[in-house]
Amino acid sequence: MKKLVVVTQQVDPADAVLGATVAKLRALAARVDELVVLTDSATAGALPDNVRIRTFAATHRARRGMRFETALARELSSRPRPSAVLAHMCPIYAVLAAPLARPTGVKVLLWFTHWRRSRLLRTATRVSTTVLSVDERTFPLQTSKLVAIGHGIDVSDLPCVKRPEREPLTLLALGRTSAAKGLVTILRAVEQVPEVRLRIVGPSLTEDERVHRIALERMVIDLALLDRVDITGPVPRHAVPSLYADVDALVNDMREGAADKVVYEAAATCMPVIASNHAFDTLLPERLRFEHGDPDSLAEAIRWLLEADRQALGRTLHGTVVRDHSVETWADRVVELAG
């Protein structure tokens, strides 16, 4: 009997930021006899019948850590014992799990794809059996433990869309209003190409992000882009496929070190994507890439896209995502590495 434990922040298919995790959990559940999910909170009925959920939410961090360790210790002492504990995006889970799991022979896997390095991440890397990421450029530390497994996109939820030839071309920038997303660069590029419109869609979850949103809104006014740029709040996870279908191309200037999942999601829908991050050089042709922080380079790529065969580009990108970055291939690799 194959059993796997996954630790994640939240199980909520409607969450605009963490909703994509649910597809990963479902794919893992389809490949094991029992999946145990340790989480702060979970939406009832979101996962299959062979999934057990243990919540460890608490009002204080120390108590939350104690509740997590108690829940994990019970799973490690039960039979059959899990083959591995997968810590999803939060290094602290790997750090807390390792002293309990590894002495019993249970592997600790850390999934992490972000540019931010920290002392906690270094510790988590040291105590984990294996580190998983999209590829070697989406994990900020050098380690021989790193295994590239793709991004894990639920392509079944993102059907290929044949988009009409619309004018003006509508670009989408999707995600949190973080300065790391390069939205200022995108606005300055759009200013240079009057044939396009831009939709910026996403939440502002921190004070810095709320301040940045205000700055972006002011910038739209200063650049006289009110008739071509819309900035709106997040859409629920179930509405994302419709959002992709309503636009013509995604533009992304996320800083190096994190392969933004929205790039792969948009590509899965047969939509052209223009992005700067070098992690996308195995997905995107050179003409769909630009220099990070360079609005002139981005404007040139947008102008090229205006004249390109966007349907053909989209079909090619879709095929690459299905082959290398689907949630099915991601789950296959996790289960294989869990042993």
Question: What are the residue ranges of the model-derived segments?
Answer:
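A charged, aromatic-enriched C-terminal amphipathic alpha-helix characteristic of glycosyltransferases
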Residues: 307-338
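Nucleotide-activated donor-binding/catalytic signature segment of Leloir-type glycosyltransferases, i.e.
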Residues: 213-234
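Short alpha-helical donor nucleotide-sugar binding micro-motif in glycosyltransferases
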Residues: 234-235, 242-247
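A conserved mid-protein helix/loop that constitutes part of the nucleotide-sugar donor-binding site
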Residues: 19-26, 178-192, 196, 211-212
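Donor nucleotide-sugar binding/catalytic pocket of nucleotide-sugar-dependent glycosyltransferases
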Residues: 54-57, 115-118, 125-160
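Acidic donor-binding loop of glycosyltransferase active sites
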Residues: 245-258, 271
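Glycosyltransferase donor-sugar binding loop
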Residues: 40-42, 197-215
